[in-house]
A protein has these predicted regions:
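C-terminal motif of bacterial Sec signal peptides marking the signal peptidase cleavage site
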Residues: 16-17
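Surface-exposed, glycine-biased beta-strand/turn segments
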Residues: 29-145, 152-154, 172-181, 186-187, ...
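Short, structured interface segments
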Residues: 205-225, 390-392, 503-523
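Proteolytic processing hotspots in large secreted/extracellular or virion-associated proteins
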Residues: 399-401, 411, 440-487
């Protein structure tokens, strides 16, 4: 076998601190780092390893090669004034997607000038209460597009263009596609102010550079300069049993995890495994200027006896494939440990093109075999971390732990195009909505507070869905009178989430991309409106605790005026436009939730 080299002794190597950052401590005086970031052994240790691990036929050691050195430099400029400090890196692992760009810090405040990164024209504008919030897309002369997200406000001609169309369409949330050259821009021109709109967790600028094919590329490969002082760091290793029948009924593999600081790595204590096929995973972080800000890893490779097992490198990606992050990581360990482990093997259902592997990322170990494993990670500045561990095949070794499953009333084998009928529930799993077949477990639990139906435990929340599944519930006659107020909810330990649903006769239908607990309830409560300020400028606190705010209308004497809604703060705000002359008016705010419940605020207003 390619990766099987039997030996009776074990080589003790300390392979930490292998980065190019000279400020990092080294744990071995016998190791030095050459200019190509390859490990170099002392003469004494080289003799030892030749005696211990010499294959019958010499095999050339695997050397990692970075596919992309960089794009055109100096074309794109920093869109913010001053130095770049990063709070989110390219292709960082997020909830259910890869992070498409680079998040630039703005010191915890809004209102920084945002400038066009290069000459071009505005090709798309969007305002949404979700996603990127206020966002601009600028097309450039080289065919690339830059994206500026979570903006507080647009500036100049862009602001006027947007407001004019908001009034024309009588909408706050809007998407526009200006004609080529209609809104031309020069490099360095102020286009907006930074903000915290949409799905942002704090003030910053989200910045992307997309190639002519629409793929997001790493801004750091385009010559943007950042201050990167710290090397990446390997935290833990995961080991998976991957024989033909080892996939657990939950859809996960038997596993164990090993700390970088444990004896198996620090003292090279052999890890004993039963004979079979194994794959690996890694928990690792990158940092730029401080370890409080954890970033993602984009270069990684794993070897067994110096031969490639698996490698990946990400420098661009397609948005349509973003949800395949659930195949790139270990969803079970993400749920169990609240940490994100990257799988160092490619599953058959994973179409992402970032990988190079041998034997499907599997390592075959027989009884008595011993293998030296080396794992390397690297950041864009060229700094590295690496670890070494030793595997030993032993037929008497303990089995790896199986993923935990719960008690269920019924178990159904789920494949593509599977229909499950369970009491009043009907679940349809379309083609390509799951990553691989698994035992779908169902259980009926007691009615929870505020719900009508008993709770359906629909498998486990750690099992991801790639696309929507269709769920139906047969509604009892006594609930039909709720009509359009009937809806589905999902629950976790602390919260209830609105899932929507449409009533067709006596069947409520909805879609979901998450598994877990579900129940049927209703929403008859209208939103609450509390005035904070009503005058030339106005602010209202608007809340809806069930289905959520769907739409709102603000008017002066029944004439529509522009207002803005920020769900994170539950604030609707705006300014009376200058074309409203001084006088006495009726100010009105109407807010409707997702089940049609409506509230109205009305007051005389003297301007």
């Amino acid at each position: 076998m390619l990766f099987k080299q039997t030996f009776t002794g074990f080589l003790i190597l300390a392979l930490f601190g292998c980065g190019t950052d000279s400020s990092q401590d080294s744990t071995s005086d016998n190791l030095v780092q050459d200019t190509k970031s390859e490990l170099v052994l002392s003469e004494k240790e080289s003799v030892k390893i030749k005696k211990i691990l010499t294959p019958p036929v010499p095999i050339k050691p695997f050397k990692f090669k970075q596919q992309v050195k960089g794009y055109t430099s100096n074309f794109f400029a920093n869109p913010l004034d001053g130095n770049i400090f990063i709070s989110g890196s390219f292709c960082e692992l997020r909830g259910n997607h890869f992070h498409a760009g680079m998040d630039m810090r703005t010191g915890g405040i809004e209102g920084w000038n945002v400038r066009a990164s290069a000459d071009g024209y505005v090709e798309r504008i969007k305002i949404s209460t979700r996603g990127y919030g206020r966002v601009l897309y600028i097309r450039h002369t080289n065919g690339y597009t830059t994206v500026y997200g979570h903006l507080q406000q647009f500036k100049g001609a862009i602001a006027n263009y947007v407001k004019e169309r908001q009034y024309k369409q009588r909408k706050f949330e809007i998407e526009l596609f200006p004609k080529a050259g209609e809104l031309s821009l020069k490099k360095g021109q102020i286009i907006a102010l930074s903000g915290n709109t949409g799905g942002s967790g704090g003030p910053h600028l989200h910045f992307e550079i997309r190639n002519p094919s629409g793929q997001s590329t790493n801004p750091l490969l385009h010559g943007l300069m950042i201050n990167d002082k710290l090397k990446p760091e390997i935290k833990r290793i995961s080991i998976y049993r991957r024989d033909q029948n080892s996939l657990h009924s939950t859809g996960n593999y038997p596993y164990t995890t090993i700390s970088k600081w444990g004896d198996q790595i620090q003292k090279k204590k052999p890890i004993k495994l039963k004979p079979g096929n194994y794959s690996f995973g890694v928990l690792a972080n990158d940092y730029f200027t401080d370890k409080k800000n954890v970033l993602g890893i984009n270069y990684c490779w794993l070897t067994a006896n110096d031969q490639l097992v698996y490698s990946y490198q990400i420098h661009k990606f397609n948005f349509s494939q973003g949800r395949y992050i659930n195949a790139h990581i270990d969803p079970y360990l993400k749920w169990k440990e609240k940490k994100i482990y990257v799988r160092l093997f490619k599953e058959p259902f994973n179409p992402l093109p970032y990988y190079q592997q041998k034997n499907k990322g599997n390592l075959t170990i027989s009884d008595g075999d011993s293998v030296i494993m080396r794992l390397y990670i690297k950041d864009y500045a060229g700094m590295m971390d690496s670890v070494l561990w030793v595997l030993h095949g032993d037929k008497n070794a303990s089995e790896l732990a199986k993923p935990v499953g719960g008690i269920s009333d019924e178990v159904k084998q789920v494949k593509n195009n599977t229909r499950i009928q369970f009491y009043e529930w009907d679940i349809n799993v379309p083609k390509k909505s799951i990553y691989h077949p698994f035992d779908f477990k169902l259980k009926i639990k007691n009615v929870k507070s505020g719900m009508l139906s008993k709770t359906l435990q629909m498998h486990y929340p750690y099992t991801p869905l790639h696309s929507y599944i269709n769920v139906s519930y047969t509604v009892p006659e006594k609930w039909i009178s709720y009509g359009s107020k009937l809806c589905a909810f999902s629950m976790d330990v602390s919260r209830t989430y609105y899932e929507g649903g449409t009533l067709h006769g006596n069947v409520l239908k909805f879609k979901t991309r998450s598994l877990g607990e579900y129940a049927i309830g209703y929403d008859e409560l209208p939103p609450t409106i509390k005035p904070i300020q009503v005058g030339k400028s106005y602010r209202f606190s608007v809340k809806d605790n069930l289905s959520g705010v769907k739409e709102f209308i603000c008017s002066i004497d029944d004439k529509w005026i522009l207002a803005e809604y920020e769900p994170k703060t539950n604030i609707i705000s705006g300014t009376i436009p200058n074309w409203i002359k001084p006088g006495e008016y009726i100010f009105k705010l109407i807010v409707k939730d997702n089940r049609g419940n409506t509230s109205k605020f009305q007051r005389k207003l003297i301007l």
